[in-house]
Amino acid sequence: MTEQVIDENKLIAERRAKLESIRPNCSANAHPNTFRRTHKAAELQAQYGQNTKEELEALGFKTSIAGRIMAKRGPFLVIQDVSGRIQAYAEKSVQADLKERFQGLDIGDIIGVTGQLHLSGKGDLYVNMEQYELLTKALRPLPADYYGLADQEMRYRQRYVDLIVNEDSRNAFIMRSKVVSAIRNFMIKKEFMEVETPMMHVIPGGASARPFITHHNALDMPMYLRIAPELYLKRLVVGGFERVFEINRNFRNEGLSPRHNPEFTMMEFYMAYADYKDLMDLTEEMLSSIAIELLGSAQMPYGEHTVDFGGPYARLSMLEAIQKYNPDNATIQAMTYEQVKDVEFMRDLAKSLGMKIEKFWTCGQLLEEIFGETAEWQLMQPTFITGYPADISPLARRNDDNHFITDRFEFFIGGREVANGFSELNDAEDQDNRFKAQVDAKDAGDDEAMFYDADYITALEHGLPPTAGQGIGIDRLVMLFTNTHTIRDVILFPAMRPQA
């Protein structure tokens, strides 16, 4: 057992002893629930922070505050609530009357304080403590070096501690909530209806990914946590709801990385009588307005860069992007879509770039992998990438001028994909054939290929109007708005391996 663990156990024992010592003096409960707060710290700062010391004394304003003790220096306490921090001061008369109880307070305890509001000589507001009540005794101490809480793994495993001590973490999740609310409000103003679709699917679909599998005991059948809500949302468009959206979780049984978590949040929406170009315009409008609303500017820092959400956003085909970011590669500069259709040509090109390839990859998959290897990470400013091949876009409508590609885009910022959208495939026969091609790919070893969904084909046979749909990764978008570079910093409880 380490010295640090021994010291922590000693502190826990001391705090338990303090709790036991006050129990006999508690007529009802050592964890009372009758104290009522009148103000939060930030409210007091906003309403009275500009007053002079003399004005506050003349006002004689009494308040009740509540929160966690974050510092204790002699007769001063620093109390933190959800809005911020404020000091409380115990006068000598109070200390004499409540000295033993006051000395028993520890950093981390949650207390309620009532008293008159004053201004210190340094210009800080404080509550002159007339009475206080211990509301919750903290049995575990905060980390000794809690300012900053440098241990990343502890921050993720004990997010509650991280939120107590790390203002940046609190602000990140406050911003996350604001981003989600702003997106929801934007969609409602655009006359989209918010809906909820199943989280457990009989057939996983809507994206190319490996699903989580569970078992429904009552029905005695396997079920899958959803990898995307797409096929259910489009069924609703078939049913006559012309504009729908959903903000919810998706689950993909894949690896962990700074940009991937198996459980993540998406906003997915569908819009009848629109195409993928309409979605790009809508995305520009949404993100620029949200940035200005939440940050006061369309420009925001991201690492060493400044991302400009003001628009218009760049629009490049995947082939154009590969050529733009490989200016010295003569083969790539001369490449055409006819060559992209040649799987052997694409294999040789990928190998020449030092890439490891899978034998079942199609020409479209090879093009996408080359794009990811050489171009994607360089797309710092908002950029729409179009021209995705049909073989990697099984639910997207083919382009009228070039049937090899689809009317699809992915949206990139900060070197990563944030959104994916396309004009929907509403040809039931074409969709049937593409599902069958996905089954063949799965049989060939691609465990991320889609399943065949016969009921969805039936829905299409009833008629899906011309429709466009898009998914936006909320977690990755919040990473941009909070200038963070790992997805775990914007997910409250990210996936972690069990501790040994």
Curated annotation (Swiss-Prot):
Q: What is its EC number?
A: 6.1.1.6
Predominant location of this chain?
cytoplasm
What do the Gene Ontology cellular component annotations say? cytosol
Organism, by scientific name, is Shewanella baltica (strain OS155 / ATCC BAA-1091)
SUPFAM superfamilies, per the entry: Class II aaRS and biotin synthetases (SSF55681), Nucleic acid-binding proteins (SSF50249)
Q: Catalysed reaction(s)? A: tRNA(Lys) + L-lysine + ATP = L-lysyl-tRNA(Lys) + AMP + diphosphate
Q: What is this protein called?
A: Lysine--tRNA ligase
Needed co-factor(s): Mg(2+)
PANTHER family this protein is in?
Answer: LYSINE--TRNA LIGASE, CHLOROPLASTIC_MITOCHONDRIAL, LYSYL-TRNA SYNTHETASE
UniProt keyword terms in alphabetical order:
Aminoacyl-tRNA synthetase, ATP-binding, Cytoplasm, Ligase, Magnesium, Metal-binding, Nucleotide-binding, Protein biosynthesis
Give a yes or no for keyword ATP-binding in this entry.
yes
Q: How does it assemble?
A: Homodimer.
Q: Give the location in the cell.
A: Cytoplasm
Presence of keyword Zinc: no
| InterPro entries tied to this protein | Aa-tRNA-synt_II, aa-tRNA-synth_II, aa-tRNA-synth_II/BPL/LPL, Lys-tRNA-ligase_II, Lys-tRNA-ligase_II_N, Lys-tRNA-synth_II_C, NA-bd_OB-fold, NA-bd_OB_tRNA
What residues bind Mg(2+) 2, as annotated? 417
Q: Which Pfam families match?
A: tRNA-synt_2, tRNA_anti-codon
Cofactor binding mode and count: Binds 3 Mg(2+) ions per subunit.
Similarity remark: Belongs to the class-II aminoacyl-tRNA synthetase family.
Q: Name one GO biological process term.
A: lysyl-tRNA aminoacylation
Q: Name the positions where Mg(2+) 1 binds.
A: 410, 417
One annotated GO molecular function? lysine-tRNA ligase activity
